Amino acid sequence: MTNLKKWKTLKSKMVLDNYWCQVRQDEVELPNGKIIDDYFVSIKPDVAMVLPITSSKKIIFVRQYRHAVGEFFLELPAGNFDPTKESAEVAAIRELTEETGYIPQEFRKIGTLYDKPSKDTNQIHLFLAENVSKVGEQQLDITEEIEVVFIPVESVLEKIVQGEITVAGTVAALLLALKFIS
């Protein structure tokens, strides 16, 4: 049993609320009595992320530009979803199909992680999609330009170590999936 105590929220107000971003400013009291009046929380939708593997044991990644840091990244297919409109499972398959044109023959949830719980509210729901097959072309959003990349399962760990795969959620999903990959 821990003696740690939660913070108390004294006041909360939305300081930014638009389609792309919601930010809440909280006034909180710490267990030691200190007051922080400008603790900012990013309210983000949950993410469905899928690790797709072909029958030839290649993992399908997407390479895309991320404007916040001005770089291209290798990531697993993923996207935001609204749990009042679709399940994490449905969202994961939708994102896989939209971003890569592939669908899975076998599909299962392998975990749920918090993205960045010090500032963000969202969770990442992780799925393993095995024996995926191509069923069509990508159906990308207007903000997306995505290259589909195939990497053999046995090469992935080295690519993480070499710094070629650096997005935290993708790295966590890959490491977690090692237990489940047959």
Report the location of each language-model feature.
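Extreme N-terminal tail/first-helix region
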Residues: 1-17
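Conserved Nudix-box catalytic region and its N-terminal flanking loop in Nudix hydrolases
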Residues: 2-6, 39, 48-94, 140-142
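Nudix hydrolase/Nudix homology domain
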Residues: 2-7, 72, 141-182
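A short coil-to-beta-strand element that immediately follows conserved catalytic motifs
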Residues: 8, 103-110
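Short, solvent-exposed loop/turn elements at beta->coil junctions and helix N-caps
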Residues: 12-14, 111-116
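Acidic, metal-coordinating catalytic segment for phosphate/diphosphate chemistry
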Residues: 13-49, 54-55
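Active-site-adjacent beta-strand/loop module that shapes the phosphate/pyrophosphate-binding cleft
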Residues: 25-32, 116-135
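Short aromatic/basic micro-patch
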Residues: 75, 126, 150
